[in-house]
A protein has these predicted regions:
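Boundary segments of small protein-protein interaction reader/adaptor domains
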Residues: 103-105
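Active-site SXXK
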Residues: 65-93, 206
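Short helix- or helix-capping micro-motifs
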Residues: 125-132
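Short, well-structured active-site flanking segments
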Residues: 81-100, 187, 217-226
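Penicillin-recognizing serine hydrolase domain
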Residues: 3-57, 63, 112-116, 121-124, ...
Length: 315
């Protein structure tokens, strides 16, 4: 068995899944949106971030998906960068009017933040990514808006109407797009930091972001690996990702770090990171499913194939 696989490469394993599992994948394409893309990150100091990975779409007709909450990875990474560069990581953020129900989309997933509650920035990052709380994303948005506008960072007295809220979102999203255009050469369709809008992005852009997170040893990777948040205001929140939760033994896998789930109609998505060694990872993107059960079944099939094929390979 070892001799059989010793010369096979990870890109060859990934590419081989396209024909091997096509009939199975095809049965899950109920929405017509199904996209399954695998990425291999194997870092070389002489390569740029955008060229430091291999990726292959093993099922699907398009290079674009509706990311839903996967888009939060882009937003939160930017917010964390701004907050850290302004030395606010140890401060307390007060929830303001940015989470008013009359402002936000009624379909947005929330954890029920209340005006006047206080959280640290990293607690809000955890809430944004682990239970995928849209209200936490909006609170981070308002703080970063204040920083960029040279307002007192915890202020929300200016937020008096839906028009003010919309201006905040438009401004923040323009800054996020500018940031990724400048730092990673990405042209993102990002018009709400939570991913609630149905804008299309390229799957390769997701790979570029994940490559950057790994290369920079981002705090985000430690956060999305958690099965639940730390205790926040006396409460913990479970991850939306079954593959990092030991209480979900059918799916839990010790090599999976996380990354993000996403959920809009016709776009139930799952992005996982399979760790091979400190500088070698495989990301699994399953997007466009009808339900989350299908994203997990497809991902389980791919993980089992990786386990079987990678077991005898020396890296």
């Amino acid at each position: 068995m070892k001799d059989l696989f010793k010369n096979i490469s990870i890109p060859e394993i990934i590419t081989g899944m396209e024909s091997k599992f096509y009939p199975i994948f095809n049965r899950y394409n109920i929405t017509g949106n199904l996209n399954i893309t695998l990425f291999n990150f194997n870092f070389n100091e002489n390569e740029s971030i955008e060229n430091s990975f291999f990726y292959n779409k093993i099922y699907g007709d398009s290079e674009y998906i509706v990311p839903a909450s996967i888009l939060k990875l882009f937003s939160v990474n930017y917010f964390l960068n701004i907050i850290e560069s302004n030395n606010l990581v140890d401060k307390k953020i007060t929830v303001g009017d940015e989470i008013r129900k009359t402002y936000i989309n009624p379909g947005l997933h929330r954890v029920g933040l209340k005006k006047g509650q206080s959280y640290s920035p990293l607690e809000l990052v955890e809430l944004s990514l682990v239970p995928s709380a849209g209200d936490a994303v909006y609170t981070l948005s308002r703080v970063v808006y204040n920083i960029l506008k040279n307002n007192p960072w915890n202020d929300f007295s200016w937020l008096k109407s839906k028009a003010d809220w919309i201006e905040m979102i438009q401004f923040i999203c323009s800054k996020i797009r500018d940031y990724y255009r400048t730092t990673l050469n990405l042209d993102l369709n990002l018009f709400d930091p939570t991913g609630i809008q149905r804008d299309l992005i390229q799957v390769k852009d997701i790979g570029t972001l994940v490559s950057s997170l790994i290369n920079n040893n981002s705090k985000i990777l430690n956060i999305v690996a958690k099965s639940q948040t730390t205790k926040i205001n006396g409460r913990t929140y479970n991850s939306t990702n079954a593959f990092v939760r030991k209480d979900k033994p059918y799916f839990y896998h010790p090599k999976i770090i996380g990354l993000k789930t996403g959920s809009l109609s016709g776009w139930k998505n799952l992005l996982l990171l399979y760790k091979l060694k400190p500088i070698n990872y495989i990301a699994i993107l399953v997007a466009g499913c009808e339900n989350h059960s299908d994203t997990k079944k497809i991902s389980s099939l791919i993980i089992k194939e990786l386990d079987n094929k990678l077991f005898n390979i020396s890296f």
